[in-house]
């Protein structure tokens, strides 16, 4: 789906306030990344720091942080589990998030309760209006 020129693939789930997407990989692992609109708002991303593989995470944990010339963001999500994988390509070359936000997952989490994912993250059809309002605000 396109919203004011920004792409939001239909097969992902979204959290519009944090501008993140989730891809359910199997019944316990999810990939997490930044939306097209989120990368646009951040500007050129020059650093990504992520939890290490094997680390436990909970709703207070910073799963990853992103730095750009105009913004630093720490991403906490209501997820409990363990870091299953870290995208080292993104850590080494963070600007690929700007180029390919949906191919550039940052972390994969083995989630303890998949119902939390389904309650927190929504299909684009359910959060379209929130993203549309945000896009109108930032695009001039």
From Swiss-Prot:
One of its GO terms (biological process) is glycine decarboxylation via glycine cleavage system. Binds 1 lipoyl cofactor covalently. Its cofactor is (R)-lipoate. CDD domains: GCS_H (cd06848). GO terms for cellular component: glycine cleavage complex. Pfam families: GCV_H (PF01597). This is Probable glycine cleavage system H protein 3. The keyword Disulfide bond does not apply. The glycine cleavage system catalyzes the degradation of glycine. The H protein shuttles the methylamine group of glycine from the P protein to the T protein. It comes from Saccharolobus solfataricus (strain ATCC 35092 / DSM 1617 / JCM 11322 / P2). HAMAP family: GcvH. The modification N6-lipoyllysine is found at residue 70. Keywords: Lipoyl. Residues 29-110 form the Lipoyl-binding domain. InterPro entries: 2-oxoA_DH_lipoyl-BS, Biotin_lipoyl, GCV_H, GCV_H/Fam206, Single_hybrid_motif.
